Amino acid sequence: RDKIIYMDLKPGESLSDKILAEQLEMSRTPVREALIRLSAYNMVVLKPQSGTLVAPIDAEQLEIEQFSRLTMEKEIIKLACQNQTPELKWVYESNLRAYELGSKNDDPEKIRHLHEIDNNFHGLAFAATGKIKSYLHMHSYMQHIERLRVLTLMMKADNNINSDHTTIANAIVVGIERLAVETLEKHL
């Protein structure tokens, strides 16, 4: 999954369960089972007789995932604005600092690191409202949007990520629901 999300395996690339099994030092059966699970998320295309391919990023699936994500996050942000805690400000500040420092880093793992920090940011409001399981569930089926987000980070196409996060976090911490939601809508 991660190799597809982080573009180590690119859309259209052919996959061999035999080669994957050798690379992962395991038998072919668990590799085949993993490929079947990935096909259920439209991340790979299983073609009997001709092999397996990394699926392209699907525009229709992106739209579904984006709608689901925006709908859930807006509601969670509204709840977070109503239930601020003193700790929440510190947690958001820590995340924002980590993203800022990570964005200045030239580490080869920079994209993975920034993506993880970004995901953590979006999970904070869920955690603050006691809805972390909802976040984990949502995140588990957001495969195509994750791939697009990684591509965006790779192309440095969105330099406003931390700025948007700062506005959202500050609005949540002081309970300005409208600003938090409007910024989230623009951000996503």
Regions found by a protein language model. Give the residues of each.
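Unusually extended, aromatic-enriched hydrophobic runs near protein termini
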Residues: R1-E13, S27-P30, A40, N162-L188
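Short linear motifs at protein or domain termini
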Residues: R1-Q82
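Conserved amphipathic alpha-helical segments that form helical-bundle/coiled-coil interaction surfaces
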Residues: E65, I77, Q84-V150, N162-V174, ...
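Loop-to-transmembrane-helix entry motif
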Residues: T152-M155
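Active-site loop of classical SDR/Rossmann-like NAD(P)-dependent oxidoreductases
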Residues: A157-N159
